[in-house]
Amino acid sequence: MSRSLLLWFLLFLLLLPPLPVLLADPGAPTPVNPCCYYPCQHQGICVRFGLDRYQCDCTRTGYSGPNCTIPGLWTWLRNSLRPSPSFTHFLLTHGRWFWEFVNATFIREMLMRLVLTVRSNLIPSPPTYNSAHDYISWESFSNVSYYTRILPSVPKDCPTPMGTKGKKQLPDAQLLARRFLLRRKFIPDPQGTNLMFAFFAQHFTHQFFKTSGKMGPGFTKALGHGVDLGHIYGDNLERQYQLRLFKDGKLKYQVLDGEMYPPSVEEAPVLMHYPRGIPPQSQMAVGQEVFGLLPGLMLYATLWLREHNRVCDLLKAEHPTWGDEQLFQTTRLILIGETIKIVIEEYVQQLSGYFLQLKFDPELLFGVQFQYRNRIAMEFNHLYHWHPLMPDSFKVGSQEYSYEQFLFNTSMLVDYGVEALVDAFSRQIAGRIGGGRNMDHHILHVAVDVIRESREMRLQPFNEYRKRFGMKPYTSFQELVGEKEMAAELEELYGDIDALEFYPGLLLEKCHPNSIFGESMIEIGAPFSLKGLLGNPICSPEYWKPSTFGGEVGFNIVKTATLKKLVCLNTKTCPYVSFRVPDASQDDGPAVERPSTEL
């Protein structure tokens, strides 16, 4: 009986009409992607599950807990002993007599090794994300056409452009630039950085910052992703072959007024970006197509051309049996080494303002875990837009040139000569980068483009990058900028300090005392820079040996390279050359001295 009733009951259920599908109430709020809140701390990775759940992957962060906030014992101990970035900067920029002692002892190498490892470890290797993939993927690793990303993009379905904080619409980029970045009055760099430095920065970085106009802002044409001197030799083999002489390893050149200069486009038919109306014989052909824009860029192109051909002569004398290809390739490696040496020991030294004397010695890292590979990050590209360095006008000798007179000036380099331009650029002070309101109106559009590009690529807020690089997030705009008026304006536009964008945050942050920029530019920029420099193959144990550079002669050129040698071994007279303007007591006007003949 009971079995019969059960069968009738089951049959009744089968005959019932299906339950209607209940649609969500149109007025009910859509669940917010929990990763929009950036809940995972200390480099934990947010993974979304379902609609409103997430999980933080805290693997190897040193932290545990739902949001990676509970430190392990060793992590807690390390954090307790680690000085703050501001305190570290204070120590390194004070007490000159103490650092003179340190620089003369083995302690210098110990500290340099510590600096290199701590900074480099902040950069993920292999690379993690790119503009198309906000998660680990094979494409992010293998496709070198992309810039890598340190942090994934802001999720597309967040309530606000920067996640959950701030206003529904970001302030107009043009308005931001005019209010906070446009120069009112030229602010010189308190560290004494000069235009020789500014043009070196532009020339040097254009070998690896080459956003692809055809593919879009997330892509790069500089597939070497590091110091490969593509701006000297070209970023592809076809361009390189057009620039080479194919004799004794040398590059093509022309002689004007008894001096060596890059060849004309007529002699080396490569694409160069010059205004219409400039004939091919007046256009100089070099590795980077935009270097005709500024005489300062073509000045460095000329110096490195002369250096390449000079080193070829030295190697030819050492190795008379070598052919053109081996002379060319070995000279290229030597110039890569010279570049890295100058960048670390003079360029980065000037930027840092440290009394600790930085040292380029790849052997410092031979005993530690280190990957000799690099990938340029989009954040590094944005960070490096240091256009406040540029002055209101350019002074050469007794003449002063406006931007209209200076840009695409194809005759200045030859008319004045290398020595005169080096002397002039070394004596003219550059602008302060940080602190805001110091960008000339002629180049303000570049900052506007960077801000717009960062929005298209959905870069995370400035405070998230501070946390990623071991700094505390700012709690207010006044804490960021150090003054009330600008802070109030930023508050009005953004609504929340946690909604401030990456590039404006870097340029508006208050500077360290007597410094060219603030804490974040140093703490974020230094890891990218040092990892890129020391991650070069020539710094690896397999490459860093005399035979790589043609013997002790070539190896010695690398190990003793300086900016002064780059100039003075390739000019008839030796002008004042430095990345810093001369002290007032030394600045007695243009003067030259006989060049040194040592290697």
UniProtKB/Swiss-Prot annotation:
Q: Report the PROSITE patterns cross-referenced here.
A: EGF_3, PEROXIDASE_3
Annotated Gene Ontology cellular components are: cytoplasm; endoplasmic reticulum membrane; extracellular exosome; neuron projection; photoreceptor outer segment
Instruction: Give the positions of the site Aspirin-acetylated serine.
Output: 529
Free-text remark on how the cofactor is bound: Binds 1 heme b (iron(II)-protoporphyrin IX) group per subunit.
Molecular function via GO = heme binding; metal ion binding; oxidoreductase activity, acting on single donors with incorporation of molecular oxygen, incorporation of two atoms of oxygen; peroxidase activity; prostaglandin-endoperoxide synthase activity
Q: Identify the InterPro entries for this entry.
A: EGF-like_dom, Haem_peroxidase_animal, Haem_peroxidase_sf, Haem_peroxidase_sf_animal, Oxylipin_biosynth_metab
Its localization reads: Microsome membrane; Endoplasmic reticulum membrane
How is it placed in the membrane, per its record? Answer: Peripheral membrane protein
All residue ranges annotated as the EGF-like domain in the record: 31-69
Q: Which residues are glycosylated?
A: 67, 103, 143
Q: Which domain of life is it from?
A: Eukaryota
So which residues are the signal peptide here? Answer: 1-23
Q: List the disulfide bonds.
A: 35-46, 36-158, 40-56, 58-68, 568-574
Write down the top EC class of this protein. Answer: oxidoreductase
> Pathway, per Swiss-Prot/TrEMBL?
Lipid metabolism; prostaglandin biosynthesis
Function of the molecule: Dual cyclooxygenase and peroxidase that plays an important role in the biosynthesis pathway of prostanoids, a class of C20 oxylipins mainly derived from arachidonate ((5Z,8Z,11Z,14Z)-eicosatetraenoate, AA, C20:4(n-6)), with a particular role in the inflammatory response. The cyclooxygenase activity oxygenates AA to the hydroperoxy endoperoxide prostaglandin G2 (PGG2), and the peroxidase activity reduces PGG2 to the hydroxy endoperoxide prostaglandin H2 (PGH2), the precursor of all 2-series prostaglandins and thromboxanes.
The protein depicted here goes by the name Prostaglandin G/H synthase 1
Source organism: Homo sapiens
